[in-house]
């Protein structure tokens, strides 16, 4: 049997072996606060997927906009009351070609509630152009993967 064929068979065997399926199991959504707290404190690579349409606009009963996104939790704080706080920021350009800085912050409460805040800033003056806040739940609107 040619060497490249043997290498292909070996690669396929490793790729599809039961040992390689462990990563898929570890990447399942994790629906509770305690598991999330343990994951961040253990230094796990945590990602959040958010679906704002499954959340509510803060202080209202209206659903959020049909926007989905994800982020990797690079830094976090577990505060004295147990709140897990993390944030991200990025520079982007709006559809009208206006450059903006977007600051997104999240707070995960011990009861499984997730508060999502977004602030859009003028990149030259840091003036606030728009703010919005949403209330989500772990497993409904906000899912965590590690």
Question: At which residue positions do the language-model features occur?
Answer:
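Bacterial N-terminal signal peptides that target proteins for export
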Residues: 1-11
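Positively charged, low-complexity intrinsically disordered regions
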Residues: 4, 23-24
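Exposed, low-complexity/repetitive linear segments and helix-based recognition motifs
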Residues: 24-25, 99
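N-terminal secretory signal peptides
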Residues: 25-94, 126-127, 145
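Acidic, glycine-rich flexible loop segments
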Residues: 88-146
């Amino acid at each position: 049997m040619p060497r490249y064929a043997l290498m292909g068979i070996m690669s396929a065997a490793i790729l599809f072996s039961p040992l390689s399926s462990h990563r898929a199991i570890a990447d399942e959504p994790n629906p509770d606060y305690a598991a999330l707290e343990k994951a961040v404190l253990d230094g796990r690579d945590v990602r959040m997927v958010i679906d704002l349409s499954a959340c509510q606009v803060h202080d209202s009963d209206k659903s959020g906009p049909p926007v989905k996104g994800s982020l990797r939790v690079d830094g976090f704080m577990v505060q004295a009351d147990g709140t897990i706080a993390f944030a991200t920021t990025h520079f982007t350009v709006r559809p009208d070609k206006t450059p903006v800085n977007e600051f997104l912050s999240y707070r995960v409460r011990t009861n499984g509630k997730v508060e999502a805040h977004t602030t859009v800033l003028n990149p030259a003056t840091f003036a606030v152009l728009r703010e919005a806040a949403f209330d989500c739940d772990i497993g409904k609107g906000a899912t965590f993967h590690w």
